[in-house]
Amino acid sequence: MAGLLKKTTGLVGLAVCDTPHERLTILYTKTLDILKHFPKHAAYRKYTEQITNEKLDMVKAEPDVKKLEALLQGGEVEEVILQAEKELSLARKMLKWKPWEPLVEEPPANQWKWPI
């Protein structure tokens, strides 16, 4: 449907997506699946899950691409797809990094004090 409405995004290097609803649904679902592996208390899981669910609900509720772009407030729908891809990539990295675990060693006493 997006291909019928516009021929270009107007952004260099960013091609028009013919199936933005399908693409966003897949990306948001994959992100939510990865977040299920995080502990429930992890801040990244809590807030990313909330935002991703809100965006997924918008994608499911609004069939018109232009209205969806306005709802998501992320620019062109292709830019939103790019953001969703980056969030999925970050979620995978965060799962590997495990930032919710305690530090391996204690930080120096005045690490965050400035000026020293």
Curated annotation (Swiss-Prot):
Localisation: Mitochondrion inner membrane
Coiled-coil positions: none
Post-translation changes: Acetylation of Lys-98 is observed in liver mitochondria from fasted mice but not from fed mice.
Keyword Phosphoprotein: yes
Entry-annotated residues carrying N6-succinyllysine: 98
Keyword Zinc: no
Main location: mitochondrion
Knockout mutant characteristics: Lethality around embryonic day 9 (E9). Conditional knockout in the central nervous system does not lead to any visible phenotype until mice reach 10-11 months of age: then mice become lethargic, lose motor control and have difficulty maintaining balance. Defects cause loss of other complex I subunits and reduced NADH dehydrogenase activity.
Phosphoserine sites (modified residues): 89
Modified residues (N6-acetyllysine): 30, 36, 46, 60, 98
InterPro entries from the UniProt entry: NDUFA5
N-acetylalanine sites (modified residues): 2
Secretion signal, residue range per the UniProt entry: none
This protein's UniProt keywords: Acetylation, Electron transport, Membrane, Mitochondrion, Mitochondrion inner membrane, Phosphoprotein, Respiratory chain, Transport
Membrane-topology descriptor: Peripheral membrane protein
A single GO cellular-component term on record: respiratory chain complex I
Stated family: Belongs to the complex I NDUFA5 subunit family.
Quaternary structure (record): Complex I is composed of 45 different subunits.
Protein name, per record: NADH dehydrogenase [ubiquinone] 1 alpha subcomplex subunit 5
Species the sequence originates in: Mus musculus
Organism lineage: Eukaryota, Metazoa, Chordata, Craniata, Vertebrata
